[in-house]
Structure formats: structure tokens, C-alpha cells
Amino acid sequence: MSDTTLSEATSNTASHSLAEKRKILVTCALPYANGSIHLGHMLEHIQTDIWVRFQRMRGHETYFVCADDAHGTPIMLKAQELGITPEEMINGVREERIKEFSDFHISFDNYHTTHSDENKEYSEKIYNALHAKGHIKTRIISQLYDPEKGMFLADRFVKGTCPKCKSEDENGDSCDNCGATYSPTEVLNPRSAISGATPILKDSEHYFFDLPAFETMLSDWIRSGALQEEVANKLTEWFEQGLKQWDISRDAPYFGFEIPNAPGKFFYVWLDAPIGYMGSFKNLCDKDSTIDFDSFWNKNSDAELYHFIGKDIINFHSLFWPAMLEGADFRKPTAVFAHGFVTVNGEKMSKSKGTFIKGRTYLDHLNPEYLRYYYATKLTHKIDDLDLNLEDFVQRVNSDLVGKVVNIASRCASFITKRFDGMLSTNIDDQALADEVMAAGDSIAAHYESRDFGRGMREIMALADKVNEYIAIKEPWQLVKDETKQQEVQDICSLGINMFRTLMIYLKPVLPVLADSTAAFLNDELVWEGHKTLLTDHKINKFKALLQRVDMDKVNAMTDASKDSLGAPVEEEKKPAKKKKAAKVVDNSAALADPLAADPISEEIEFDDFAKIDLRIVKIINAEHVEKADKLIQLTLALNEEGTETRQVFAGIKSAYNPEDLIGKHTVMVANLAPRKMRFGMSEGMVLAAGPGDKDLWILNPDDGAKAGMRVK
């Protein structure tokens, strides 16, 4: 075999040199060890894993560690409820987590626990360093105390009447009824949520970290580029209000590490939780002597340290954690990347609706790579929430992965294996197309690096559309009937296979298992630098189905399995079967004879109303039938000629057009129409068409010279 390289015109476009090998340590937030992982957790772990896999593909020394957050009162109480020790409980949870993350293809180098010797060592080391420098303070505070359980009560374990609106059975620090916030000591008729006893007020000495001593450093650090801009802006509120000392101790009984020289006092879980990153990495270093712990954590380390977290724990990672590290003479994070929450079908996860989906429940029904891809299409570098729309999920995965990417291989492979003994041609049928797909590697790499995965996926799918368009125009299935065209068939299908290979290189961080199957089929290792080459005079293996379509019935079964049991189901009253409607005969003769009379001009509007509509020229780069939809065609519309900015639109033009006849045409769309959730997925705009309907519909075609992206005025 031989490799043909990207043509000279595009061979020097790389924007990131690989000559400099980076040292990178990456972490996810530590999931709390008292419950099951759900799809909200999986967003962060998938996001981080994609970024880590990309860095590894680029040849950088990259380590990915995590651990269970295994301390605190909730774990202690849960273990008591189960009749086991906290250690037994967290060990069982950890084993379950390791298996679950592995099944989602999360490629941790180490998954540890905060209840470890390593974490205890570094928690004490950091605390002692802070104490020696005068950054630990003590004072007496008053708290509610459960006399039956013999323990102080955290806010969450106090219930009572709201002091503002007098609503009963409200939380110890906030009221769900009126939204008020208050101190647990202000609650009327308080009771312990643990025992039901009436708590008493009791004094205790607590230990505090002197966060205000680090105000200048933190103020500079949050504006250093280590945080997203919106996060840094939000944190300025803390400085405006004045930083407060942070309570880092809890009284016995408590499951955690006892504070040195302070009997009966324990580190608050949020002190030792982030130190768990160090503990897990130290555990990895102890198992692999080639990794030097200090070179990653020393104050002057040249390694990169990144934390991926949810937006709800920004304060701990962006104020308390860097201040602790600074005070103990360790390095601070290179960056903290925060993401938003997951909603399902536009709403908060709900057990009653079956949308509070546990990781294992998902795995019991669906391929994890479906979720990895869908999350990737939605992820950006911002902290916006991400909606898992289950119908759009099915449509997007089936359309993009099965209908576009894998479809390229399935259209071309059989010709190569059956007629040419699996050998790819030495000829390149369309050098311009090959160069365009190969040259996209630099911009796609930039999207991965900046965590703009959604933009990267759109660029990859736009390329897939162009390759499918190329194959559709060339029609190798027609050419193969002509014995004089066999070389042309081999050339066309060889280029198709090569373009599929390049696209799978780009998708490998997202779809590692599909990439492995592709590598076996192509008899070639998919490495990042391979995007600059083509396989010529190379033998491939017999094609096997690489990916199955998502079945909506399996999605429904998953949500059914996620619903709370609400008692025995009530048998529905049996209804007579509906009669099948006769086909509707549409008569448009009057509308065609006098369109204005049949459809009079609408009510007059002001110019400002019209000016709100943003009409753009677009290029149709893909068109497909929509399963179980009588009227719809799914269009992929490019808003630029390069095809890197695309929109998905469902258009009711099936009665008038065959999808394949639309590919390559230019038309007009309403580009600023709010996305609309449809049964078959999300429609991101509207194309314009004329005519009364049914077969009498004509989409608008601009004159030659109009380019995708141009505004229609």
C-alpha cells in the first residue's frame, strides 16, 4: 500500500504544531457516592472524555483521573439505613461506577476514592501548611442539634415553618412556597429531618479557612483566562459582597477525615473533595513509576491542569480551591471549564415522566455511542444548559451517523470488495474534494481544543453531505453495469472509502468503538495525522454493518423503565379501531387558474414587522425522507458555500419533490425563525415555496450568482 498526501496547496495549513508535546492532567468533578449515575452526570464525563481522547490522538502526554466523593453526613446516614458500614457502601458504589463509566467508554487512567490514604495525606498536608501560615481561624458558632441522634444538623436536615410566609414543612434554609432564604435558627417549629426530634441550639468551636486573605490573588486569577468569561463575571459578585471566611470543619459523628490535633472535628467534605484530584493522581503515580507527581503539582509546574465541572460547583473550584492551593504552595489550575445542566425534552429530569434516566438504564436499552454523539452535537465552550430531546436524539443519530457517515462506506464498500478484490485504486477521482475534506482537520482540531464540539460535528457532517453528493452525482451503481467503466467505479468508490476514513478520524474522539470497527474494516490504524493522507493501492476487508439505527421503541422502553412505580396500571377502556381514512383527493385547479383570487393578500403590516424576518440564500446539501412522515422531507441547508454552517429543516414538500432531486440546489430560508420541536426532531428554520399545495408546490430558486449566506432584501 501507499499513502497519497494532501496536495501542496493545502499541506501547510496546520494551525497547531505537534512538535511541542504537552503534559496535561484532566479531571472531572467527583460524583457523590450515595446514588446511581444518571444522564446528567454523563454529560460531563462524556465531554471530558472526548477532549482527553482528542489530546491523546494529537500525541500529548495526557492523564485523566477521577474518584468518588465518598465523605459526608448523607453517606453516613445512608449506610446506617442500609445496615452496613460507610466503607462497605462506598466500595460497592465505586465498583458499580467503574463498570458503568467503562461501558460508556470513559477512558479514565485512574478512578479512585476520596476515602483513601493518598487523599488523607494531601488533605492533612494542605491543612497543616495553611495552619502554619495563619490561614486557619477558629470561633464558636451556634447550630441546631438533634438531641436524639446526638449530632449537629446541616441546613438540609432541618424542616419547619417558613418565618416569612408561614408555609409548613419547608427546608431549613429556604422556602419553596415564597422563595425566601433564611438561617435554620430562624425556622419556626423546627424539627430534625433525621429523627423528627425538636432540635436545640448548641455551641461548637469551628475551624475556618481565611479566604479573604487571598482576595487580591483570586481577583487577578479569575481574570487571567483560567475561567470562562461568564463565570468570571458572576464571581465578581463575591468580591463586591466581600469574601467571607469558609467553615471547613464538622463535628462528630461524621464520616470523613479527622482534623489534625482537633479531636472530634472532621474536615468538611468540600475541603477534601477537590484534594481528591491529587489523591487519585498520586495513586496512579504510585502504580506507574514513570509518572512524576511533583512535575504536575509543584508550584512552578509547566504541566497543564484542567478541571471539567458543572456550573453548580463553580464557587468551590474557582475561589476556595485555588486559594487553598496557593496557600499550601501548590500550583493552581490552568483552567476550570464549567458546563450547564441537562434537561430532557425541554424540562427538568422527571421520575414520573421517565426522563430521570440512570446510566445503567440507558445502557440496558441503547448504544452508548448514540449519546456520546448527541451530546457532542450540543456542546459548546459556554455554560448553557443542554436539552436531550429524545425525538431529536433519534432523528439526529439516524440521519448523521447512519444516513450520512456510515452510509458512505455502505454505498462504496461492496463494489471494492466484490469487483476489485478489496483493493483501493491508485487514482484520485476528485482531488479538490479530497483536499477539502483532508484540509478540514485543522479547523476541526481547533473546535475540539476549544470544546466547541457542536461546531466541529456540524463541520464534519457538512463534509459528509458533500461526499454523499459526490457519490450520488457519480452513480457508481449505474456505471458498474458498463464493463468499460470499471476503473471509474473503482476510482469513485475508493475516494468514497477514503473520505469515510478521514471523517472517522475526525469522529474518533467521540465514537471510539465505531472508530475501532472502522479501523478493522479498513485494515488501517486511525491516527490524527492520517487525515492528511489517502490510502491507495491498499486492501480493505469485507464490510460489515457498523452501526444500527436508533429504534424509537427502545427509547420509549428506556423511559418506561425509568418511571416511578405509581401502583398497578389501570386497564384502559377498549376503544373501537379507527377506520382508515381514504386518500384525500386534492383539486388545485382553481388556485392555479387564479392564485390571487384563491389566496388573497394578507392583512397589511408595518415595515418594522417585515424587517424582523431574516431571509437568506441557502444551499441544500442533503435531503432525506422522514420515516413515518407523509409530507416531510428533512433538509440540511448550508448557510455558506463551504457548507460549514448548517441548519436542519423539515419541509412539507414530499408530495412535490424527490429528496435526491433537491441536493445541490439553492433556495431561500427564514434564518432567524426560532427552532421548533417536531415529532421527528428539531426544525431550525423554514424554506420558502409557492403554490397551493400537494404536488403543486415550487421552492424558490435564486438566479445564478446568488451565494449561500446572502441576505434576501
UniProtKB/Swiss-Prot annotation:
Function as written in the Swiss-Prot or TrEMBL entry: Is required not only for elongation of protein synthesis but also for the initiation of all mRNA translation through initiator tRNA(fMet) aminoacylation.
Domain tRNA-binding: 609-713
Binding site for Zn(2+): C162, C165, C175, C178
PANTHER family: METHIONINE--TRNA LIGASE, METHIONINE--TRNA LIGASE, CYTOPLASMIC
Molecular function via GO: ATP binding; metal ion binding; methionine-tRNA ligase activity; tRNA binding
Principal cellular location given in the protein's record: cytoplasm
Entry note: cofactor: Binds 1 zinc ion per subunit.
GO biological process, one term: methionyl-tRNA aminoacylation
Reactions this protein catalyses: tRNA(Met) + L-methionine + ATP = L-methionyl-tRNA(Met) + AMP + diphosphate
Protein name: Methionine--tRNA ligase
Family matches, as InterPro entries: aa-tRNA-synth_I_CS (IPR001412), Anticodon_Met (IPR041872), Met-tRNA-synth_bsu_C (IPR004495), Met-tRNA_ligase_1 (IPR023458), Met-tRNA_synth (IPR014758), Methionyl/Leucyl_tRNA_Synth (IPR015413), MetRS_core (IPR033911), MetRS_Zn (IPR029038)
Keywords: Aminoacyl-tRNA synthetase, ATP-binding, Cytoplasm, Ligase, Metal-binding, Nucleotide-binding, Protein biosynthesis, RNA-binding, tRNA-binding, Zinc
Cofactors: Zn(2+)
EC number per UniProt: 6.1.1.10
Record organism: Colwellia psychrerythraea (strain 34H / ATCC BAA-681) (Vibrio psychroerythus)
Residue positions of motif 'HIGH' region: 31-41
Gene Ontology annotations for the cellular component aspect, listed alphabetically: cytosol
Binding positions for ATP per the UniProt entry: K351
Family membership: Belongs to the class-I aminoacyl-tRNA synthetase family. MetG type 1 subfamily.
Domain of life per record: Bacteria
Subcellular location: Cytoplasm
Motif ('KMSKS' region): 348-352
Quaternary structure, from the entry: Homodimer.
